[in-house]
């Protein structure tokens, strides 16, 4: 879904993960970070083949969501533009 038409929602679980895993997460503008990750994050089409397989595996674990690499983290979004969770990236190479 186009985020310019359908805004991106942030699940409570995802917001907690930002606070836990992102440096200085409690002082961030969560909505801005999520919008930037969605707009500028790298998908499985923009990374190396090995990393692409890893991102696609994550996507299948989240009911075919979208995994985007942004600022050394992997952000996972649902098909309905809901930010579900995030992981620190230690595997994916651009």
Predicted regions located by residue number:
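Ribonuclease/tRNase effector modules and their secretory precursors
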Residues: 1-94
């Amino acid at each position: 879904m186009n985020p310019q038409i359908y805004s991106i929602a942030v699940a409570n679980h995802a917001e907690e993960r930002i606070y836990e895993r992102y440096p200085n997460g409690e002082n961030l503008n969560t909505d801005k970070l999520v919008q930037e990750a969605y707009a500028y994050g790298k998908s499985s089409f923009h990374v190396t083949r090995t990393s692409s397989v890893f991102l696609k595996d994550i996507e299948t674990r989240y009911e075919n969501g979208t995994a985007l690499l942004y600022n050394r983290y992997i952000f996972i979004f649902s098909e309905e533009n809901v930010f579900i969770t995030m992981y620190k990236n230690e595997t994916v190479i651009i």
